[in-house]
Regions:
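Catalytic palm active-site di-aspartate
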Residues: 14-18, 44-54, 80, 106-114, ...
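Short linear motifs embedded in intrinsically disordered, charge-biased segments
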Residues: 272-313
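Basic, alpha-helical interaction scaffolds
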Residues: 199-266
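Catalytic palm subdomain of template-directed nucleic-acid polymerases
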Residues: 53-70, 131, 140-167, 269
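Active-site palm subdomain of RNA-directed nucleic acid polymerases
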Residues: 1-14, 115-144, 243
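Conserved pre-catalytic core of RNA-dependent polymerases
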Residues: 1-108, 144, 305
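Mobile genetic element proteins and their domesticated derivatives, centered on retroelements
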Residues: 1-4, 30, 50, 67, ...
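Short, conserved micro-motifs composed of acidic
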Residues: 95, 157, 172-206
């Protein structure tokens, strides 16, 4: 497998389960290009694509064929085929259990090898695609400028190519969950189809758990993050009896602060009101520590990092 990876089979557009890449790199790289176009006054359409049970639909025979094409030796291919094919499953419906059946598709997600095999399987998804395509495992999005008829046709041609790839590789798009986000004030709100079905438009979409809206305004994700973190902080306040610093600080750092910092380099608030909304969470958390209830915030911080200061740096 290492020899395959050394040949750079997994493309730069794939950020999932890839060394040195993450949800953050996926968002920053994709939207950096998209926002450049919007800043120049261009209209841009982004199509969010959703595969139906992506990992479960990977055909073992097609995967083996691709591994051979990408240069993996026969011995390793046979080992992988044995690892995948010697799996069986049964189902229960209304209390009746089926017989055991060998599984001819699916790569396991709980092991390191499974996601790597999926990345290899989906590598050629973008062959022939002209617009910007970005992947995080099976989460896929396609974007391009649509000021001109040619730009809109280019996106439609790419969608046709992606649908054709899915059919050839025995995969399916969940078209009810595929959405179009129109960006830029010149947007014509063009309609696209995937196969024979027209895709719905949306004013905001969750992309890798970060909300992106048609105005590229980060106040909404900021508010959602603050609400989620506030809920966790409220649960801690109600359920934790101890109010010692040694208890509150680790719990806050482990359960609350990650919500505030997940991909924050991408959605970092630009408005003072949004920054202060996040900082109030930490102010509330420091008040939970016994003996600090009436101490001013700057002194309560102690060795805690100030969220506002961290973002200003």
């Amino acid at each position: 497998m290492e020899q395959v990876l050394k040949r750079k089979v997994i493309r730069n557009s794939q950020h999932g389960f890839t060394k040195g890449k993450s949800c953050l790199t996926n968002l920053i790289v994709f939207y950096d290009e998209i926002t450049d176009s919007v800043d120049m006054g261009k209209a841009v359409d982004v199509i969010y694509l959703d595969f139906s049970k992506a990992f479960d639909m990977v055909s073992h025979s097609i995967l083996a064929s691709k591994l051979k094409t990408y240069g993996l030796d026969e011995g390793n291919i046979r080992w992988i085929e044995s690892w995948l094919d010697l799996r069986a499953q049964w189902v229960v419906i209304n209390g009746s259990m089926s017989s055991w059946q060998l599984v001819s598709s699916r790569v396991p997600q709980g092991l390191v090898l499974g996601p790597v095999l999926f990345n290899i399987f989906i590598k050629d998804l973008e062959d022939g695609v002209d617009c910007t395509l970005s992947k995080f495992a099976d989460d896929t999005k396609l974007g391009g400028e649509v000021d001109t008829l040619e730009g809109r046709d280019r996106i439609q041609r790419d969608l046709d190519k992606l649908e054709d790839w899915a059919k050839r590789n025995l995969m399916r798009f969940n078209k009810d969950k595929c959405r179009v986000l129109h960006l830029g004030w010149k947007s014509l709100m063009h309609h696209y189809r995937l196969g024979t079905e027209w895709l719905g438009s949306s004013s905001a979409e969750k992309d890798l758990a970060v909300t992106v809206d048609e105005k590229l305004d980060m106040s909404q994700p900021c508010a959602l993050v603050a609400k989620k973190a506030n809920n966790v902080l409220g649960c801690l306040s109600r359920s934790i009896a101890s109010r010692s610093r040694d208890v509150i600080v680790p719990l806050y750092s482990t359960l609350v602060r990650p919500h505030l910092e997940y991909c924050v380099q991408f959605w970092a608030p630009h408005y003072k009101k949004d920054v202060e909304k996040l900082e109030r969470l930490q102010q509330r958390a420091t008040k939970m520590i016994r003996g600090l209830e009436h101490v001013i915030y700057e002194e309560r911080l102690g060795n805690w990092d100030c969220l506002v200061c961290g973002r200003q740096e």
